[in-house]
């Protein structure tokens, strides 16, 4: 039986008034999602390390409102979420096709080290680390029990975000082992749901509530284009989805053109 800490996404989304999202924030979310998907496609077409198609909503929704001092640890230097955090396109596109990926063990250990330093310095910064288990249903979160135990024991300001493309074999056992670690599941293709969970999780962790693990899961009907999903949602709210989509596409095309021009300019 889940502990009270292992809350549902729906419950988390309704706390502390974060269920209300302004029209401007909806626009920003949609623009960010579209640009993330376009960048992901650009990276794949260039033969560079890229995220799995249609998995952009989770990282984008979590990273969007992080503060400059917050640290994001991503699988590769070409991950689209670097742009969401504020990295310009040029250095992302300039990464070689052989850009190395950090191992999961190293990334989780780095998250613990950085967040421990944040806690010691009392700088109010948090660490977000995005990881997956390689789409392998036999993969085990329990292989990293020690890292999660350290994070919980020290109430470290870390958000562990698991991009879960397949159910993993020991999820119930993991939750029982780490009963004090909030474990939240949210639809990986729904950026609005992700954003709401992100806001609650960030506020809780930044306020001294300790770490949390959020699973970006395929809920319900399986894989779906998150841009199309949000487009339909905006339509139900009477918001100008077509206009915003055109704006976002044009803006990213202009940004990409400028970045590519800078790359080809030896004086840039």
What spans do the regions from the language model cover?
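Conserved acidic/glycine
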Residues: 1-57, 127-128, 138, 217-268
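Phosphate-binding glycine-rich loops and adjacent basic patches that engage nucleotide phosphates
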Residues: 2-8, 21-32, 104-111, 141-147, ...
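Short charge-dense sequence patches
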Residues: 8-22, 131-137, 151, 155-162, ...
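A generic structural signal for short, non-catalytic loop/turn and secondary-structure boundary residues
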Residues: 26-28, 65-67, 153, 207-209
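Cofactor-binding active-site loop characterized by glycine-rich and histidine/acidic residues
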Residues: 38-153, 173, 178-180
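Thiamine diphosphate
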Residues: 157-255, 267
